[in-house]
């Protein structure tokens, strides 16, 4: 089965001072986090990668990543642009914040015509997520279902925390058939002195459990889902409460599409430990974690020649 890895790499981390965070070297030979994702995706069966980037990143991105990776896997690019809006809408002059992961993914419409997995550029997901998503899409996806049959990798919350501050996660609830029933964006999740704290979007305390399943934006999708994204974008733009900051977010679109009976999403559990550079101080932990995986033989010392 042809399948594509879509890497959302257009965002610059507002909290991670200095440099584009997804380009920070973490491997023994200067590898970056997404090198390991590409390696794991290819090993699982994905045979193409599409990077979603910004036009101003293109030159550096191709030099640092694309040209090196294209010897190993087919590479293509899509561009997220603030001004890429449906007819009748204009970007407010003062807005500098990208429109969010939903708009980012819309940029691959017409470029990706096969099942795909979408990930964040700056998250390390481990091998299991790619394997279970590829296997589901190749062997279990119901192509005749009235609803689009999609899937996601669900991570265990305790495997996705940062030692250096609070994180935002989509806390997931599955139904009796292991289909995603609800995704709730939850903020400032932090384990401090043995106490797990979190708040909802209004800043009110929210109860979460270390064993909750969370989304790390690793979704197994099909080109038809992009039609749902496209349909929802003008509605989002028309209902914004803050035109400088509101974002069209993938988990929210998926949550709405589930509740509207347009899609079903199989929750595929991954037991791998996530890590990423949410905070500058996380980098050392990531470097040490990658080193440990190389020492264990999970990865070769040098993954791309």
Question: Positions of the model-derived regions?
Answer:
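A short, conserved beta-strand element in the Rossmann-like catalytic core
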Residues: 13, 124-126
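A C-terminal functional module that forms or caps the active site or interfaces directly
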Residues: 230-263
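Conserved core of the sugar-phosphate nucleotidyltransferase
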Residues: 127-219, 223
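N-terminal glycine-rich phosphate-binding loop and ensuing alpha1 helix
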Residues: 1-66, 73-75, 80
